[in-house]
Amino acid sequence: MIVPLVTIGQTKLYDNVFIKADDVNAYDNFLKEHYAKIHKERVSQGMLLQWDVWKVVDTPQEDFTHMVTYIYDIEKYPNQAAPYEMLGMSNLQWGTIQKKVNQMRERVAQVKWIDLGSARKKGMDYLPEIMVLNMMKVKDGKAGSYEKEEIKRTKSINNNSTRVGWNFHRRIGEYGNDVYFTHATIDWFDSYKDYLQGWYGEWSDSTEQGFNWNELRELKKMVVMKKLISSTDQ
């Protein structure tokens, strides 16, 4: 069974913070202990649509260890309520938590993006365990052509594929000519093994059938991450 591409309305705003943790396990535990409850409460009160933490897999040389994603409804953004107030915490208590987490990690980057399109296998109505984030930089003057081509060429996902989903995003915000990436695609998998098995197959030339992606965009980075925490978790 094949599910057709769905072009998503411009209602979601993704705010992504890239983190470099000194002690990864300590940071993982700190997030679970102090932040998961706060952001689940924000979701339940409608201040966030979703909150997810992704952890880089098997790539110690990567320049970040985690990606924290806040998904907002643009119609309700921003909200002014402090997250800690919803849990009855004082400003001092919140400040202490922030001081501790700042000693564990560094915020190395923050970017926002919006939806352009997606494709899913039938029955994939959940957040998968594995995300493959592809950071793309569009060629000068080719943004419109690239976006149309990306959507056109991922209209569906074959039922035999190890991939269960795909998303396409446009980076937004204030950045200059020296931007590292302008777009992102995400490939979703149910397990790391499924992702690895996707590499077992015959490769083709980039110019097969007269089309070359390199004329429209450059793949700057591909990072595999696993789900650590999500507000969708039961």
Predicted regions and their residues:
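Hydrophobic h-region of N-terminal signal peptides that target proteins for export
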Residues: M1-G9
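Short S/T/G/P-rich N-terminal loop/turn motif that feeds into the first structured element of a domain
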Residues: I8-L92, T96-Q234
